[in-house]
A protein has these predicted regions:
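Long, charged amphipathic helices and adjacent flexible linkers at domain junctions
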Residues: 47, 106-143
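Conserved, mostly hydrophobic/aromatic
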Residues: 11, 21, 57, 79, ...
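C-terminal binding/interaction regions
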Residues: 216, 224-232, 236, 242-248
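Conserved alpha/beta-domain cores
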Residues: 1-56, 62-73
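C-terminal helical cap(s) of enzyme catalytic domains, especially alpha/beta-barrels
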Residues: 93-115, 243-248
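Glycine-enriched alpha-helix->loop->beta-strand junction motifs that scaffold or abut catalytic
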Residues: 13-18, 23, 83-85, 172-176, ...
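Glycine-rich phosphate-binding active-site loops on the catalytic face of alpha/beta enzymes
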Residues: 18-29, 76-99
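Nucleotide-binding motor/catalytic cores of P-loop/tubulin-like NTPases across gene-expression machines
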Residues: 164-166, 172-209
């Protein structure tokens, strides 16, 4: 609501993430302000690396029709281009007649938009708002290396509490982030972060054998021998300790 928007920065400082619920927002603010607020909320969440979900009426017509309107397709596309980590359906899947088609349509649009994202511009903008920490420096370096090296097809981030993967996600790399964690709850939490594919591993000594595990994970997720991945982790291990990156060949 309006009060939440007015206090957005203080909310973001303590929240795990934020949702742009356009329906609720539209009850209290003028219609023409909703898209302005949406872009502003997404931008601020992106700047500090907190996941942001855009929701409500995204493919509303698909509750009764197998295809969306062109305006709805544009709405989904713009939510992705604005920087949403997640785009969410509600009634379309909870009560609509075409739930599978709605999810498929949203997926197709999102993937198409991700191909068009100006990754270099996004990275340069994110660098300006970075916290100038070791973890941000690692995230920037990982995203930059992925842009410069065509052979790099993915990032493998070993993460205990999820902060390493979220920090990399903040800088919007152009390849997927395989976030390897040994905790189921962390795996679930990372589902909302942009570009992150959370993977639970029960290989407890993975941090001392990360090259081998990274190759296994890469091949399990569609990469092939000869591709390259960027590995990042923290030594010694612990939440928020990311201080290492290396580029290795999948074998």
């Amino acid at each position: 609501n309006q009060e939440g928007y007015d206090n957005l920065e203080s909310i973001l400082s303590v929240a795990d993430g934020v949702m742009v619920a356009r329906g609720d927002l539209g009850v209290e603010v003028s219609t023409q302000l909703v898209p302005i607020y949406q872009k502003s909320i997404i931008k601020k969440a992106n700047e500090i690396g907190k996941p942001v979900i855009t929701a409500t009426h995204m493919l509303e017509s698909m509750m009764a029709n197998p295809r969306p309107t062109r305006a709805e397709a544009s709405d989904v596309a713009n939510a992705v281009l604005d920087g949403s980590d997640c785009i969410m359906l509600s009634g379309e899947t909870a009560a609509g007649e075409y739930p599978i088609e709605a999810v498929t349509t949203m997926d197709i649009i999102a993937r198409a938009m991700e191909e068009l994202l100006p990754y270099r511009e996004r990275l340069d903008a994110a660098i300006k708002s970075s916290n100038k920490t070791v973890q941000d420096a690692i995230g920037i370096s990982v995203a930059d290396a992925a842009l410069q090296l065509d052979k790099v097809k993915a990032i493998v981030a070993f993460t205990q509490g999820g902060s390493t993967a979220r920090r990399i996600s903040k800088f919007r790399p152009c390849v997927p982030i395989f976030a390897v964690t040994f905790t189921k709850s962390v795996q679930r939490k990372l589902e909302t972060s942009w570009g992150v594919i959370p993977i639970f591993s029960d290989v407890q000594n993975a941090m001392t054998n990360d090259d081998e595990l990274a190759s296994i994970i890469a091949k399990d997720n569609g990469l092939k021998e000869g591709d390259y991945v960027i590995i990042t982790a923290g030594y010694p291990t612990g939440e928020g300790t990311a201080n290492m990156m290396k580029i290795v060949e999948v074998k």
